[in-house]
Amino acid sequence: MISIDIYAEKSLTISNLPLTIKDNDLIIGRCLNISYISYLYFSLPPVPANTIENASLVLFKTGTFLNCLKTKEAIAIHPLLDYFSSRTNMLNRPKYDPALTQGDITEGTVSTEIDLTAIVNSWAKGQLVNKGIVLSKEEQQYFGFSRYGSAYTKDPTLKPVLRIVCKESPLPFL
């Protein structure tokens, strides 16, 4: 098996209220009347689709989490159909594919790992163009938010990682 770790190249958190953070955290969820949605982009190397065993997004916790008792813990992740930029806001969000979503979520002490095998395979097979992913809370009617390191975090150990595990290939593909 070969494991490839790809660090996030771009990230963005948007909210229905102006954010005061300096791109150090991805925030996902809702607190009172404030909703947070985050975006990530990874520049993928050419990986043959038939060699991908699994792919997972590893997010590193950075601090404050607010999870009320009724908050559904699942994070919803979907592949983007359009690009995001620093001009993205709640009024002009990129479209995403609602049918394609993440797999299992594993909660650790310092990180959260989310299965993205279906999404990464769709990119590798050319079914979708990699324009990034959107992260939001599955149940926005409940209160709760999570904070993770972003692509712009000063601490490199907190940057989001896309980990792709491949079968060994007789030919190099990197």
Q: Where in this protein do the model-derived segments appear?
A:
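Proprotein-processing/basic-patch segments
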Residues: 2-9, 22-24, 29-34, 125-174
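A short beta-strand-loop element at or near the start of a globular domain
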Residues: 12-64
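Residue-level detector of buried hydrophobic side-chain packing
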Residues: 42, 55-57, 77, 114, ...
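Short loop/turn segments at connectors of secondary-structure elements within structured domains
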Residues: 51-53, 71, 129, 158
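Core residues of folded domains in eukaryotic genome-function proteins
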Residues: 38, 110, 158-160
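Conserved catalytic loop of SAM-dependent methyltransferase domains
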Residues: 7-14, 115
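Beta-strand-rich interaction/scaffold domains
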Residues: 66-129
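Acidic glycine-/aspartate-rich tracts in secreted/extracellular proteins
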Residues: 62-64, 82-85, 138-141, 168
